[in-house]
Regions:
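Structured, contiguous alpha/beta core segments that scaffold functional sites
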Residues: 1-184
């Protein structure tokens, strides 16, 4: 995961903002204009709950935070109305964020949480059956000499200096059990 620093709070804020954007499964006309919202399992995932552990808001936050951490992720359909290996069209009932661990010409190996077993598992799926999302700024944000990495190093250095300057000093407030009177 990303470093526990001020950058984490910035990433978290971006993820929260993204999770508040309304995403819907809709039908468009021939000019690309909105016609109607489709009542589907996919729309349910995008507006109510993505899976039994995550609301749609937490799911989108997971997507965005994973993009910051990994750079490229897969949104994996977990439960579908029909077997997706045999169908060209299907309705998604639940989905999860997965980390892509291996690339193949037509498939990807994905580390994804199995909520039935309570563990992460490696699965291989066709690329055309998962949504592969890439953070276009990942390499820029994580390059050794990027502005963000320089800022992280400087903030960590300032934190270390603050820690050292406070070390070895003892700040105490002493309260005596009786009233002390002095002549003024």
């Amino acid at each position: 995961g990303n470093e526990r620093s001020i950058v984490t709070s910035v990433y978290n804020r971006i993820a929260i903002d993204c999770s508040r954007v309304a995403i819907r499964h809709v039908r468009l006309d021939s000019n690309g204009r909105y016609l109607e919202t489709i009542d589907s399992g996919l729309n349910n995932c995008l507006t109510i709950e993505a899976n039994k552990d995550q609301s749609y808001v937490m799911f989108i936050r997971d997507v965005v935070q994973s993009l910051f951490d990994e750079g490229c992720i897969a949104i994996v359909p977990i439960d579908t109305v029909v077997d997706i290996s045999k169908a060209t069209s299907y309705d998604i009932e639940t989905m999860r964020v997965g980390k892509i661990t291996q690339w193949y010409p037509d498939n990807v190996k994905i580390n994804v949480y199995n909520d039935r077993k309570g563990i992460h598992e490696e699965i291989t799926m066709p690329k055309n059956k998962v949504a592969i999302i890439e953070n276009p700024l990942y390499s820029i944000m994580n390059e050794r000499n990027s502005t963000l990495q320089r800022l992280i190093r400087k903030l960590n250095l300032l934190d270390a200096i603050d820690e050292q300057s406070g070390a070895g000093k003892l700040d105490l407030i002493i309260q005596l059990p009786y009233v002390v009177y002095t002549e003024a």
